[in-house]
From Swiss-Prot:
One Pfam family in the UniProt entry: ClpB_D2-small
Domain of life, per lineage: Bacteria
UniProt entry keywords in alphabetical sequence: ATP-binding, Chaperone, Cytoplasm, Nucleotide-binding
Name of the featured protein: ATP-dependent protease ATPase subunit HslU
C-alpha cells in the first residue's frame, strides 16, 4: 500500500486519533500536522496547472523539551510511510567552515525515501526472489563439479575485476545422484530442518567506515565522491560463514535487488522525497541570533541564511539525482527559552507561517503518559519482566505517586518533560530488574509505599535529586 493510498484513507480527525494512541495532549499541534498532511493529499488530486502553485505550509513548534514535538512528526511519518528525516540545527555550520553542510538534510531524506521504496518493491518481487534464493542456497549446500573456464584474464581484469563479470555461477555438471541429493535438501530446507547448519556465502563488502565517519563530520562531499567512485568498479565480494537461516535473508536481498530496476528505484525515491518528504529541524532556537552576539551571532545567522534557500525551494544534487525541495514539508522546533521566534532572520520566519505553542505537561498528563498510550512506559516494563515469568502490577496510587514525583522534580530542577519518567522508573525498578532472574515469584505488586521507600530518600535531598533524577 502506497503512502498516497494511506493518506486517502485517513481524514485529519482519524490522523489525530492515531496520534492520540501514542502522544498525550498537544491537540493543537496534532491538528496542524494532520491538516498539513491532508493538504498534501488534496494537492495530488488537483490539476497540474494549479498544483505547482500550492506549496506546503511549514510548521514551527514552540515548547520545552520532552512535550512531544519530535514524536508528533515521527509518528505521523510512520502512519503514512512518508520519508522522514530529523536533523539538529546546531550540527550545521556556515559554508566554508568545518561542520555538516545544510544540504545533507536533503540527502538524508532521499536515502530514507529510496529505502522505503525499495522495501515496497522487494515485497512485490518477494515470491520470485525467495524462489531464486532457495535455488542458490540448495546449490551451496550440495555443490557440483563446475566445468573449468578457459577464458584468460587480462592484467586490468585481475586488478579491478571484470566489468562484465556474470552473477551466475559457471556451467555445472549435474548427474542423477546430485539431483536426488538436492531434492532431499530442498525438502529439509522448506521444513526448517537445516536452519542451524553453517554455509559459506559471498556477500558484498561494506563501504569503508572512514567515509561513514566523514558524513557526520561535515565532509559530505568526500562521501559523495566515494559513492560516485563505487559505481565505476564492480563491488568486491567476500566469503562469510553464516547459518542457513541468515543465508536465506542475505540471498533473498541479493536476488530481490537483481529484480528491481535501480534507475526506476532512484526516480521513484526522489519523487516521493520531493512530494511527500518531511524534514524535522530540531533546536532551531539555538541558531536564532540576538543583538550583541559577536562572532557567534554572525555564525548562527550564516546557518540560517544557508537553510533559507532549501526551505524556499532549491535544486540539491544527490547520488540518486537532483532533488527539488520546494514541496518538502519542513517542521522546525525549539524551546525558545533564551530567544524567541522573532530572533530568527525575517526571511526564515516567513517560511514557517504556522506557529504552534505546545503545552507544558501537568501532573495529570504524566499519569496518562504512564498508562494510556499503546507504548506506555509501564506496559514496557511489564513486558520486560514478563520474559522472566513475573507479572508486574502497579496500583493506581503508585502510578499517581510516580506522576506526582516526576512533575515535582521537573518543577524544582530542569524541566525535561516526559523524559523525566524514564529516569524515575529506571531508578524505582533498578533492584527488581537486577534480581528478577533469581526471584521465584509469579507476580510483584508495586504500591505507593514501595515508591516512597525507593524514591523518598532521594526526593528529600535536593542535591541527590538533581544528580540522580
Amino acid at each position: 500500500m502506497t503512502n498516497l493510498t494511506l493518506m486517502n484513507q485517513l481524514t485529519p480527525k482519524q490522523i489525530v486519533e492515531k496520534l492520540d494512541q501514542y502522544i498525550i495532549g498537544q491537540t493543537g499541534a496534532k491538528k496542524s500536522v494532520a491538516v498539513a498532511l491532508r493538504n498534501r493529499y488534496r494537492r495530488q488530486l488537483m490539476d497540474e496547472s494549479i498544483r505547482d502553485e500550492i506549496i506546503p505550509k511549514n510548521i514551527l513548534m514552540i515548547g520545552p523539551t520532552g512535550v512531544g514535538k519530535t514524536e508528533i512528526a515521527r509518528r505521523i511519518a510512520k502512519i503514512v510511510r512518508a520519508p522522514f528525516s530529523k536533523v539538529e540545527a546546531t550540527k550545521f555550520t556556515e559554508v566554508g567552515y568545518v561542520g555538516r553542510d545544510v544540504e545533507s538534510m536533503v540527502r538524508d531524506l532521499v536515502e530514507v525515501s529510496v529505502r522505503l521504496v525499495k522495501e515496497e518493491k522487494m515485497q512485490l518481487v518477494r515470491v520470485k526472489a525467495e524462489k531464486n534464493a532457495e535455488k542458490r542456497l540448495i546449490k551451496l549446500l550440495a555443490p557440483s563439479q563446475k566445468k573449468k573456464q578457459t577464458t584468460s584474464q587480462n592484467p586490468l581484469e585481475a586488478l579491478f575485476g571484470s566489468m562484465n563479470q556474470p552473477d551466475e555461477p559457471a556451467e555445472e555438471e549435474v548427474d542423477q545422484e546430485l539431483k536426488n541429493k538436492r531434492s532431499q535438501i530442498e525438502w529439509r530446507l522448506q521444513n526448517g530442518e537445516l536452519d542451524d547448519e553453517i554455509v559459506t556465502v559471498e556477500v558484498k563488502e561494506q563501504q569503508n567506515p572512514m567515509f561513514d565517519m566523514m558524513r557526520g563530520t561535515g565532509m559530505d562531499q568526500m562521501s559523495g565522491m566515494q559513492d560516485a567512485l563505487s559505481g565505476m568498479f564492480p563491488a568486491k565480494k567476500k566469503k562469510r560463514k553464516v547459518t542457513v537461516r541468515e543465508a536465506k535473508k542475505i540471498l533473498f536481498e541479493d536476488e530481490a535487488s537483481k529484480l528491481i530496476d535501480s534507475d526506476e528505484l532512484a526516480a521513484e525515491g526522489i519523487h516521493r522525497a520531493e512530494q511527500m518528504g518531511m524534514i524535522f529541524i530540531d533546536e532551531i532556537d539555538k541558531i536564532a541570533s540576538k543583538e550583541g552576539g559577536g562572532n557567534a551571532q554572525v555564525s548562527r545567522e550564516g546557518v540560517q541564511r544557508d537553510i533559507l534557500p532549501i526551505v524556499e525551494g532549491s535544486q540539491i544534487s544527490t547520488k540518486y539525482g537532483t532533488v527539488n525541495t520546494e514541496y518538502i514539508l519542513f517542521i522546525a522546533a525549539g524551546a525558545f527559552h533564551m530567544s524567541k521566534p522573532s530572533d530568527l532572520i525575517p526571511e526564515l520566519q516567513g517560511r514557517f507561517p504556522i506557529r504552534i505553542e505546545l503545552d507544558k505537561l501537568t501532573q495529570e498528563d504524566f499519569y496518562k503518559i504512564l498508562t494510556e498510550p499503546d507504548n506506555a512506559l509501564i506496559k514496557q516494563y511489564k513486558a520486560l519482566l514478563k520474559t522472566e515469568g513475573i507479572d508486574l502490577i502497579f496500583t493506581k496510587e503508585a502510578v499517581e505517586r510516580i506522576a506526582e514525583i516526576a512533575f515535582q522534580v521537573n518543577q524544582d530542577s530542569d524541566n525535561i518533560g516526559a523524559r523525566r519518567l524514564h529516569t524515575i522508573l529506571e531508578k524505582l525498578l533498578e533492584d527488581l530488574l537486577f534480581e528478577a532472574p533469581e526471584i521465584n515469584m509469579e507476580s510483584i505488586k508495586v504500591t505507593e509505599n514501595y515508591v516512597n521507600e525507593k524514591l523518598a530518600p532521594i526526593m528529600t535531598n535536593k542535591d541527590l535529586t538533581q544528580f540522580i533524577l
